[in-house]
């Protein structure tokens, strides 16, 4: 907060791009159902030790130092994030707008699926379901338990799950009736493009998502995404046209979405819809033009 204020004191137009809710709360990156940030973060329900529950109020009050700077502008990547700003006690009055994340649509693009699988040493004749999480299956925001239950309700000798992340716990997937492959952490865009092209469906069971960068990466490669209807995901997925939006935390609907995506994985019309959508909304050209329009309005 101190560093942000030191920049604001320069008096120049200052933009903060909100990747999560941290700026709006007493410390939470995602508030989920908690609405305390609407008025005052105090007695945080996520802090178990009574002796330190005051911390969130202290952090929240500390952020009040920022709210009256007229040169502060907030940019949200989705309508959901913008709505959170509008409801926040701290920054509801601050100038704000929605500009989505951008994507290198030249780098992330379709390539031959067989070639991609051969290069990654993945099976050629199996339906592959990709799940990605920054901390493998251990990140609570990524909803692995829900996806695990959805996959547990599926069966088929011709299916396999591919997990992208830091690690995969063998015990957590041992009950599945199909094979699994751990890709570990992949950070370069070339390898990610190969992986998206190698699979048949990309599933995000995320319970907190300000945007959904991996979703547009998959779409740009022609791979159908499946995700819950929450956060910034509805800004990206148009139900059954550019992916599948499952009802929030609905395991059965998530399973149905995966099966729908698998059955439409070679649908050229859907692939075209996805690629066109990414190009028209998230390409470098489109997004940078939005930033420049905003800059020209206030400079």
Locate predicted features.
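Donor nucleotide-sugar binding/catalytic pocket of nucleotide-sugar-dependent glycosyltransferases
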Residues: 23, 39-113, 117-122, 128
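A charged, aromatic-enriched C-terminal amphipathic alpha-helix characteristic of glycosyltransferases
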Residues: 266-298
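Short hydrophobic beta-strand element within catalytic cores of glycosyltransferases
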Residues: 224-227
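Conserved acidic donor-binding segment of nucleotide-sugar-dependent glycosyltransferases
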Residues: 239-240, 244-251, 260-265
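Conserved donor-binding/catalytic core segment of Leloir-type glycosyltransferases
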Residues: 123-142, 148-151
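Nucleotide-activated donor-binding/catalytic signature segment of Leloir-type glycosyltransferases, i.e.
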Residues: 168-190
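Short alpha-helical donor nucleotide-sugar binding micro-motif in glycosyltransferases
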Residues: 194-199
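Aromatic "clamp/platform" in nucleotide-sugar-dependent glycosyltransferases that forms part
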Residues: 207
